[in-house]
Amino acid sequence: MSYGWAIYEGTVVIASLSLLGWAGLWFLNRRLYKEYEEKRALVQIIFSVVFAFSCNLLQLVLFEIIPVLSREARMINWKVDLFCLILLLVFMLPYYHCYLMLRNSGVRRERASVGAFLFLSAFLYAFWRMGVHFPMPSADKGFFTMPQLVSRIGVIGVTLMAVLSGFGAVNLPYSYISLFIREIEEADIISLERQLIQSTETCIAKKKKIILCQLEVERNQGSEENQKRSSFFRRIVGTVVRSVQDDQKEQDIKILEAEVEALEELSKQLFLEVYELRQAKDAAAYSRTWKGHVQNLLGYACSIYCVYKMLKSLQSVVFKEAGTKDPVTTMISIFLRLFDIGVDAALLSQYISLLFIGMLIVISVRGFLTNLMKFFFAVSRVGSGSSSNVVLFLSEIMGMYFLSSILLIRKSLRNEYRGIITDVLGGDIQFDFYHRWFDAIFVASAFLSLVLLSAHYTSRQSDKHAIE
């Protein structure tokens, strides 16, 4: 019986990791790599492995509540997952990322290896020094221990999560509530489209002039060859005249090229403005449908929760409190105290906890992947380097993000579900610090996002579609 159960547990672990790895590979090739030809096999393998181990951490949180695996199997799975993920994040990814950048720059393989090793040494030193400024576990057992490494990764990952959450807490109501949706007239869009067409046609006409000027310069150079057969005096006069004409043509070409560049920039701005107005018009039309009304109500509900979260985070920062239960669990507890419906409060709380943790995990994964796609396309389109370098950087961020989410989700678990997580991560990790740090960065990010979105909304209302 025990042998069969061990086979079952091993099959579940291997199958889940394989499925998650395949999902990461599919996401990379179908959603990120779809516009790029450069596809390194090792980069794809690293991304899929980091994705699998990262999502497996969140899966193990669910396994703590749902008894799919035994305690021993979960403990082994936790340790192996954390060991492999930290090995990738702290050692392998920094080294290989630097090595690949040096190789892409034309550095020889031996020198690239030495340069990557030196970079890894500097990275580890900076990684160690980071712990001086934050509450860290005792270093009696050395630096390369699970609590030490997890604590430092947690600082970076929690900071990233707080920044994204702060922006989302402000941007989500702003995007959903119909109060902030503009009413756009079709005549305004048509007027801008005419400007765009006129700008494009003018740009094309000036490009044709540039080509004609270049052809004329080439003809003058050809006529210079024919003038060599003429008299000496005619050659001198012809040379002077052609020189003046060529200088004038080159000056005209430079002026035309500058005008074309300005017109292309104007056309780009006009196109973006037309696109934004079309989106705003579609959003206004959608807001008048029944789905739009539901989304509007959802926006107000999210606004209430986001305001509550911001106030609780501000309270945690100001009064240095460690935080309380999540609002959903609090509301359920109040409801059970007011209305006796004959339901076991402990049992209902357990199912509510499972549902809430599942929602946290789904929202966390979905939100991260959405921001991952936006960041990838934004960085890749401005030409910051090869797509392989961007994918390696995102792999590093992804692992830190999901590992840090465990430090925060742990507090939402009931005490009986925290045991293995606390033991594996390290009992002397300052878990409350990460919640206070998250709240501080969350409040700062939300406030900054509120200021920026308010300025954007004000400027948009004062001048809806003015383009200089």
From Swiss-Prot:
Record's note on what induces expression: Not induced by abscisic acid, cold, salt or drought treatments.
Q: Where does GTP bind?
A: 382-411
| PROSITE patterns cross-referenced by the UniProt entry | PROTEIN_KINASE_ATP (PS00107)
Top-level taxonomic group: Eukaryota
Q: What else is known?
A: Has both a topology similar to GPCRs and a GTP-binding/GTPase activity.
According to UniProt, the name of this protein is GPCR-type G protein 1
* Subunit organization: Interacts with GPA1.
Description of activity control: The GTPase activity is Mg(2+) dependent and is strongly inhibited by the interaction with GPA1.
Matching entries from InterPro entries are given as: ABA_GPCR_dom, Golgi_pH-regulator_cons_dom, GPHR/GTG
This protein's encoding gene:
GTG1
GO-annotated molecular function: abscisic acid binding; GTP binding; GTPase binding
Residues forming coiled coils: 243-279
Q: Where is this chain's protein located in or outside the cell? A: Cell membrane; Golgi apparatus membrane; Endoplasmic reticulum membrane
